[in-house]
Amino acid sequence: MQTSDTRALPLLCARSVYKQYSGVNVLKGIDFTLHQGEVHALLGGNGAGKSTLMKIIAGITPADSGTLEIGGNNYVRLTPVHAHQLGIYLVPQEPLLFPSLSIKENILFGLAKKQLSIQKMNNLLAALGCQFDLHSLAGSLDVADRQMVEILRGLMRDSRILILDEPTASLTPAETERLFIRLRELLATGVGIVFISHKLPEIRQIADRISVMRDGTIALSGKTSELSTDDIIQAITPALREKSLSASQKLWLELPGNRPQHAAGTPVLTLENLTGEGFRNVSLTLNAGEILGLAGLVGAGRTELAETLYGLRTLRGGRIMLNGKEINRLSTGERLLRGLVYLPEDRQSSGLNLDASLAWNVCALTHNLRGFWAKTAKDNATLERYRRALNIKFNQPEQAARTLSGGNQQKILIAKCLEASPQVLIVDEPTRGVDVSARNDIYQLLRSIAAQNVAVLLISSDLEEIELMADRVYVMHQGEIAHSALTGRDINVETIMRVAFGDSQRQEASC
């Protein structure tokens, strides 16, 4: 961390950076600065624009407008190769190493001949205190050391600007401390680090400055020592939204009737000491007619839990009970037939067939139930019903899903899940990457679904979304749920965030 206020010219200045996707403004005139020898932490909720900004700086994505000043020169657009030449290196959350190659081969992979210096590599290893056996396979490294290999790859390219995307998401506290020791050694050489994270205690430990992004803008920026936790929490939290569907929309939304009806409050889904990839000993009950919020940080195990419930991942221990019957051994299709429906986090790669028609997508799960072949007239009528209920904007049923905006794609995905007649609907980040108007529509929709006594499990990293929508809330921390469900006044952004971040003051928030 910086120990002096005397700094040279900034390593990086991003000025008035704008970016739009499918008509949605993702970045709205961003200014961002990084100095030599400092860690500038970047926080924000999902969809705030952090990753987009960093991809622009790293040359992966072009900005629509704005400039990047690097080394005294202004650039409108970079490529990844050009960014590397300018000393910029992005270390992704999941290190992209070749496990079957040696550590040495991974570090030197892709370097220009003039950079292929074994002596330079050895000097960097010594400076950072790395005790690698360079001839060992990269696949034998733990996560923290894989992160360091990625960082070394950047330094071998003479990188002066390192962008670390959630570098501690998969690390234990001991691994995190080891990484921080090496980062501090690196800062002493004049390298600047952009540190993207959701973990406030770690940010306070390592960062000189903090910037908070919200809805494509910088909502807060300042020295770490001058910003309180409450300041940061308030900056992350978006504005409140409205709450209910119109009467006519509710009529159009009425779900298909071929599912068992449960009285509100009836336990529908029960998890007993569930253990799987990324989570352990998770127990909870989901009731008919409620929205149960599941909050937590990136890497807390929420998506892994959801995919295990749906049968996409292997269950290692515990029991899943649906309507009082164990479903551990059932396939995904069998769980779907029994009314367990999952809306995945990534609508484009996991949720929709982007090249298929809208009508086909909406009825895709019911095609699986009655045979693959579509019934065009019936499918078009089904799509029309959801268009009216969800205010989906499109030109014709035959158009491909990829032609819609992100918000309308998400509504098509929700319609697809609803047409499968869910008893339990698991929605993972349902408003990620959609604008405020579409978010409001989705919030209204989820309430109306719950009003039909569907049990809704809402997984979201948007804590205000959880506060606004959930009847009860569990917070996952490092793969576990170590508290009883939050209810009533305890469901607030401050309490949820303190539990999720592992903040030492979290108990005070519940008083």
Swiss-Prot record:
PROSITE patterns: ABC_TRANSPORTER_1, ABC_TRANSPORTER_2. Keywords: ATP-binding, Cell inner membrane, Cell membrane, Membrane, Nucleotide-binding, Repeat, Translocase, Transport. SMART domains: AAA. It is a peripheral membrane protein. It comes from the Bacteria. InterPro entries: AAA+_ATPase, ABC_carbohydrate_import_ATPase, ABC_transporter-like_ATP-bd, ABC_transporter-like_CS, P-loop_NTPase. ATP binds at G44, G45, N46, G47, A48, G49, K50, S51. It holds the Pfam family ABC_tran. CDD domains: ABC_Carb_Monos_I, ABC_Carb_Monos_II. It is found in: Cell inner membrane. Its main location: membrane. It catalyses: ATP + H2O + (2R,4S)-2-methyl-2,3,3,4-tetrahydroxytetrahydrofuran-[AI-2-binding protein]Side 1 = ADP + phosphate + (2R,4S)-2-methyl-2,3,3,4-tetrahydroxytetrahydrofuranSide 2 + [AI-2-binding protein]Side 1. PANTHER family: AUTOINDUCER 2 IMPORT ATP-BINDING PROTEIN LSRA (PTHR43790:SF2), CARBOHYDRATE TRANSPORT ATP-BINDING PROTEIN MG119-RELATED (PTHR43790). Belongs to the ABC transporter superfamily. AI-2 autoinducer porter (TC 3.A.1.2.8) family. NCBIfam families: PRK15439.1. Part of the ABC transporter complex LsrABCD involved in autoinducer 2 (AI-2) import. Responsible for energy coupling to the transport system. The complex is composed of two ATP-binding proteins (LsrA), two transmembrane proteins (LsrC and LsrD) and a solute-binding protein (LsrB). This is Autoinducer 2 import ATP-binding protein LsrA.
